[in-house]
Amino acid sequence: MAGVNTSVVGLKPAAAVPQSASPAAAKRVQVAPAKDRRSALLGLAAVFAATAASAGSARASVFDEYLEKSKLNKELNDKKRAATSGANFARAYTVQFGSCKFPYNFTGCQDLAKQKKVPFITDDLEIECEGKEKFKCGSNVFWKW
């Protein structure tokens, strides 16, 4: 074997080499006295209680704020829900009812409702965008009224 170090060739992997049979040194673990553990546990409980109390009051104020906002928007949300229900029914039957006929519905009845009056659908789109900025309305993203 020219060029190969023979001292490296005959070695066994480290995992196959037996370890020395010397006994492991005994380890001592010290346990804190019961009094110290109790006081540490009580301190930890006090920290958790203080944190929970402050977080609970903060969550309550946010909850009250959302509840007030919900009450203010209830009438508008009820009107939107009713309009959407009627519009969904109208979308299912627009061709059958004749409100969205072929040459005009080429890009869909939703687009036609933005150009001219389509029963239920135009009303739904107007109510959906009520109280919002011009381009913040979900159905109005790519369309300019």
Swiss-Prot record:
Asked whether the keyword Thylakoid is assigned, the reply is yes
The function of this protein is: May function in mediating the binding of the antenna complexes to the PSI reaction center and core antenna.
What are the GO BP annotations of this UniProt entry?
photosynthesis
Whichever gene encodes this chain, its name is PSAN
Which protein family is named in the record?
A: Belongs to the psaN family.
InterPro entries reported in the protein's UniProt record: PSAN, PSAN_sf
Please list the residues that make up the transit peptide in this record. 1-60
Q: Per UniProt, which keywords does this protein have?
A: Chloroplast, Membrane, Photosynthesis, Photosystem I, Plastid, Thylakoid, Transit peptide
Where in or outside the cell? Plastid, Chloroplast thylakoid membrane
Q: Which domain of life is it from?
A: Eukaryota
Q: Which GO terms describe its cellular component?
A: chloroplast photosystem I
PANTHER family this protein is in? PHOTOSYSTEM I REACTION CENTER SUBUNIT N, CHLOROPLASTIC
Look up the coiled coil feature and give its residue ranges: none
Protein name stated in the entry = Photosystem I reaction center subunit N, chloroplastic
Q: How does it sit in the membrane?
A: Peripheral membrane protein
Transmembrane regions: none
Species per Swiss-Prot/TrEMBL record: Hordeum vulgare
